[in-house]
Amino acid sequence: MSQASKRKHVVQEVLGEHMVPSDQQQIVKVLRTPGNNLHEVETAQGQRFLVSMPSKYRKNIWIKRGDFLIVDPIEEGEKVKAEISFVLCKNHVRSLQKEGHWPEAFSEVAEKQNNVNRESQPELPAEPQLSGEGSGSEDDSDLFVNTNHRQYHESEEESEEEEEEAA
C-alpha cells in the first residue's frame, strides 16, 4: 500500500468511525508530548502515565495537548502503560457524552474546549471597509512580521535625503 493510500485510510478511520471504549479500554486526556511517539496522559481518576502511538498513526495523525484518546493497556509496561487505539475528535466526544460513556471528570474540560472554539471564531464585520478608507501605507502595524529576516528600519533623515535626490 502506498503512503498516500495508507494516509487516506487512516484519516477516514479516525474521522468517520464511531468508537465506544470496551471494558479494558479507557478515555484519557493528553497532557504533553515528550517525543519519540510517546504522550503523557491523565485518566479520569487523575493517574498519569505514558502511552505509545502505533505506527499506523505516525506521520498521519497529529495529537496535541488537550486532545482525548482511547487507549489499550499494556501489561508488561513500566513507564509506557498503554497504546493509543483511537484518537477522539470533537464529534466523537459529543456523541460519547450523549450516550453516557464520557467520564464525569472530563465533562467540564470538553465543555470549555467547545465554548472556547465557538468564541475564538472571528465574526465578520457588518460593513465591508472600502479600499480607500484607512488602508494607507502609514499604518502597517497590523501586517505580519517575519521574524526570520533582518528588520531594516528607515530613519526619517534617510527618507528625506532620498526624496531630495529624486527631485
UniProtKB/Swiss-Prot annotation:
Domain S1-like: 5-89
In-chain residues carrying the UniProt-annotated modification Phosphothreonine: 33
Full protein name: Probable RNA-binding protein EIF1AD
Residue numbers bearing the Phosphoserine modification: 131, 135, 137, 155, 159
GO CC annotation: cytosol; nucleoplasm; nucleus
UniProt cross-references to SMART domains, sorted A to Z: eIF1a
The keyword Metal-binding is annotated on this UniProt entry: no
Comp. bias intervals (Acidic residues): 155-167
Pfam families documented for this protein: eIF-1a
Family: Belongs to the EIF1AD family.
InterPro entries associated with the record: EIF1AD (IPR039294), NA-bd_OB-fold (IPR012340), RNA-binding_domain_S1_IF1 (IPR006196), TIF_eIF-1A (IPR001253)
Keyword entries, A-Z: Nucleus, Phosphoprotein, RNA-binding
Compartment annotation: Nucleus
Region of interest called Disordered, as start-end residue ranges on this chain: 104-167
Molecular function GO terms recorded: RNA binding; translation initiation factor activity
